[in-house]
Regions:
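Conserved phosphotransfer cores of two-component systems
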Residues: 46-48, 72-80, 101
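Receiver (REC) domain active-site loop signature in two-component systems and cognate sites
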Residues: 59
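Acidic catalytic/metal-coordinating carboxylates
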Residues: 37-40, 63-69
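Conserved sequence signature across two-component system core domains
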Residues: 9-10, 35, 53
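Alpha4 helix (beta4-alpha4-beta5 surface) of REC/receiver domains from two-component response regulators
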Residues: 66, 90-105
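Active-site beta3 strand of CheY-like receiver
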Residues: 48-54
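Two-component/phosphorelay signaling modules centered on CheY-like receiver
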Residues: 13-33
Length: 105
């Protein structure tokens, strides 16, 4: 069975470490990249084309919403990843914005 490729982005190193450990313990997942900001994640997505991207909404350089919007408009990708967004802010407008930009979860 093909493992799902996953990329993760968060500006909090502790969150990145937790996510990396969770992914590495699951035999069906394979970590293909991690980033501390949205600009790095955008480049990882273009290069690696992961199946799943877990990303924070509030990050430096590009926020998670901007990353999703740019990827949605990217013509050279063979496929768009499934986005799972993380945020410490529980505002409904942020959640709605994430789903409108392409978030799956």
């Amino acid at each position: 069975m093909k493992r799902l490729s996953v990329a993760i982005a968060d500006d909090n190193d502790q969150i990145l470490e937790i996510l990396e450990n969770l992914i590495n313990t699951d035999k069906e997942l394979h970590l293909v990249g991690k980033a501390n900001n949205g600009e790095e994640m955008y480049e990882i997505i273009k290069e690696k084309e992961p199946d799943i991207v877990i990303l924070d909404i509030f990050m430096p350089k590009l926020d998670g919403l901007e990353v999703m919007e740019r990827i949605k408009e990217e013509k050279e990708l063979k496929k768009n990843p499934n986005f799972i967004v993380l945020t410490a802010v529980g505002q409904e407008r942020i959640t709605q914005a994430a789903f409108s930009k392409g978030a799956s979860y």
